[in-house]
Amino acid sequence: MAKIKKGDQVIVIAGKEKGKQGTVLSVSEDRVKVEGLNLVKKHQKPNRVTGAEGGIVTQEASLHISNVAVFNATTQKADRVGYQVDENGAKTRVYKSNGESVAVAK
């Protein structure tokens, strides 16, 4: 189970984009797309049905989920995420380093 969710603030910990930060746009099985990182150029054909123009389009490619970590804004470092059950029985995501709850992505 991936502990990184859409909307999380992450930092890249390995690869050519190491040290850069961004917001998660999407999460699949073991890959994540991060806003503004791992940009690739795609040659796109024009499509009359959708109205898409042809040409060279720059877009985000996915990164492996093991190469990113959730960014803890209070410590300004990469952190791990765990789950904690509160007294009401609700599960909340917390940082492993300091036990603070992870901000809910909007």
From Swiss-Prot:
The UniProt entry, under NCBIfam families, shows: rplX_bact
Instruction: Give the multimer and partner information.
Output: Part of the 50S ribosomal subunit.
Specify the protein name: Large ribosomal subunit protein uL24
> What's the superkingdom here?
Bacteria
Q: Which family does it belong to?
A: Belongs to the universal ribosomal protein uL24 family.
InterPro entries linked: KOW, Rib_uL2_dom2, Ribosomal_uL24, Ribosomal_uL24_CS, Ribosomal_uL24_KOW, Translation_prot_SH3-like_sf
Known role: One of two assembly initiator proteins, it binds directly to the 5'-end of the 23S rRNA, where it nucleates assembly of the 50S subunit. One of the proteins that surrounds the polypeptide exit tunnel on the outside of the subunit.
Q: Which UniProt keywords apply?
A: Ribonucleoprotein, Ribosomal protein, RNA-binding, rRNA-binding
Q: Name one Pfam family in it.
A: KOW
Output the CDD domains linked to this UniProt entry. KOW_RPL26 (cd06089)
- GO CC annotation, single: ribosome
Q: One biological-process term from Gene Ontology?
A: translation
Tell me the GO molecular function terms: rRNA binding; structural constituent of ribosome
Q: Which PANTHER family is this protein grouped with?
A: MITOCHONDRIAL RIBOSOMAL PROTEIN L24
